[in-house]
């Protein structure tokens, strides 16, 4: 795998995940209490022995850079690296990244300096565990110019994805972006060609692109340089290249979820608590998911009832009830609180007992969840200060609302409390 260079697409300004992306690049959004989105593709790369990795982001993020430099330091042991490349405006190119392919095009000069055979293009907002060695092996064995990782899907979900058709040898011959009706029916394929059983093939007669590609080095350069107006891999570069290049499909049979929207992100996080066995698990010693070591103390839970939840390290919980929730590092919950179906992202630092006491005396709200509060079906971003007797339950069942000046948004019926927000005592949302 020393001949493979990984390029992780960090996404644009992160509008689909806003307001979680208000103060950070999308790859830096916290996940499952103690990880960040970028940890998923990076861990997959490391477990697959791919150690030359670039991360492309639309704008630079202090928290992303800090996380990567503190977590993924390969110096002294190999020629591996993890480096962030942010969009930049130059005299030759005064524009920001116009799309996924344009992002790679703008930094092609940096990628071409490496002595490698293939580029592995990855997305930064997917939740899955994959050994890229099998994927790249398939690419080499078939002599493909480009190999796409695909997932089999059923008719119900098919119209939400870019679909493709393959011939009897697994070669991609046709594309359709989010087809409906008769056009959808025409995209059915025999997925037994890719290794599914007849029963599985009947259940999932469509194949969708995961947005993960392997390119031969010279093929990617050729496609990007000869087609400067094509800015997106999934919508333009890949469909355009099917005619003249050997495109192969590689079937991925594991769990895979695009978590690039608030609803999908929220549901994928809470699904980690599903019993008896969640579809994705962080408890896998063979293929671990790496993140920064923080050396935090164990969580302290005093007279609490906690069911179907994940609690990260360094939390202080007092006399509260927590159900089907994710608690991030350094979360603090005071007495008589109820937290249900909620993701609390925790805090970046602790407030000392004396500071908390002086804040209370001044009538200010300390960090964490105040006494007697109820939070249901919400995401509370880092360092939020929730006052006493606050109720966050989307009382009026609103689907979408922008209340940024009040410290929250409602997206798809999910209340999202902003990072560093303060919610006053007695507030009802």
Swiss-Prot record:
Pathway, per record: Glycan biosynthesis; glycogen biosynthesis
Gene Ontology annotations of biological process type: glycogen biosynthetic process
GO CC terms in record: carboxysome
Enzyme Commission designation: 2.7.7.27
The keyword Nucleotidyltransferase is annotated on this UniProt entry: yes
Keyword entries, A-Z: ATP-binding, Carbohydrate metabolism, Glycogen biosynthesis, Glycogen metabolism, Nucleotide-binding, Nucleotidyltransferase, Transferase
TM stretches of this protein: none
Annotated GO MF terms: ATP binding; glucose-1-phosphate adenylyltransferase activity; structural constituent of carboxysome shell
Biological function: Involved in the biosynthesis of ADP-glucose, a building block required for the elongation reactions to produce glycogen. Catalyzes the reaction between ATP and alpha-D-glucose 1-phosphate (G1P) to produce pyrophosphate and ADP-Glc.
Similarity section: Belongs to the bacterial/plant glucose-1-phosphate adenylyltransferase family.
NCBIfam families in alphabetical order: glgC, PRK02862.1
Name under which the protein is recorded: Glucose-1-phosphate adenylyltransferase
Organism of provenance: Rippkaea orientalis (strain PCC 8801 / RF-1)
């Amino acid at each position: 795998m020393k001949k493979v260079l990984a390029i992780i697409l960090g996404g644009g300004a992160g509008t689909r995940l806003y307001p979680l992306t208000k103060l950070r690049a999308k790859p830096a959004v916290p996940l499952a209490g103690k990880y960040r989105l970028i940890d998923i593709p990076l861990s997959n790369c490391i477990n697959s022995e791919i150690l030359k990795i670039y991360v492309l982001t639309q704008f630079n993020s202090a928290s992303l850079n800090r996380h990567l430099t503190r977590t993924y330091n390969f110096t002294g042991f190999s020629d591996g690296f993890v480096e962030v490349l942010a969009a930049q405006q130059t005299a030759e190119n005064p524009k920001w990244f116009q799309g996924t392919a344009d992002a790679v095009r703008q930094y092609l000069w940096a990628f071409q300096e490496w002595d490698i055979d293939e580029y592995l293009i990855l997305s930064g907002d997917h939740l899955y565990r994959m050994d890229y060695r099998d994927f790249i092996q398939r690419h080499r064995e078939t002599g493909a110019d480009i190999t796409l990782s695909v997932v089999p899907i059923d008719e119900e979900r098919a119209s939400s994805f870019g679909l493709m058709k393959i011939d009897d040898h697994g070669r991609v011959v046709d594309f359709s972006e989010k087809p409906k009706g008769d056009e959808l029916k025409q995209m059915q394929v025999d997925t037994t060609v890719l290794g599914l059983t007849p029963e599985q093939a009947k259940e999932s007669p469509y194949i969708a692109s995961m947005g993960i590609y392997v390119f031969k080095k010279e093929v990617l350069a050729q496609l990007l340089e000869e087609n400067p107006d094509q800015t997106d891999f999934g919508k333009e570069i890949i469909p355009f290249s099917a005619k003249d290049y050997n495109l192969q499909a590689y079937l991925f049979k594991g769990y895979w979820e695009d978590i690039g929207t608030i609803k999908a992100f929220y549901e994928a996080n809470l699904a980690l608590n599903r019993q008896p066995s969640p579809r994705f698990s962080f408890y896998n010693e063979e293929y671990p998911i790496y993140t920064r070591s923080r050396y935090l103390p164990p969580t302290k839970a005093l007279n609490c009832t906690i069911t179907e939840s994940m609690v990260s390290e360094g939390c202080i919980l007092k006399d509260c009830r927590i159900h089907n929730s994710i608690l991030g590092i350094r979360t603090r919950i005071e007495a008589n609180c109820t937290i249900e179906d909620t993701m609390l992202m925790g805090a970046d630092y602790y407030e000392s007992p004396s500071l908390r006491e002086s804040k209370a005396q001044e009538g200010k709200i300390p960090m964490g969840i105040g006494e007697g509060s109820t939070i249901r079906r919400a995401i509370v971003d880092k360092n939020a200060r929730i006052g006493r007797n606050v109720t966050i339950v989307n009382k009026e069942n609103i689907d979408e609302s922008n209340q940024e000046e009040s410290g929250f948004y409602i997206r798809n019926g999910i209340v999202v409390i902003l990072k560093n927000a303060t919610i006053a005592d007695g507030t009802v949302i």
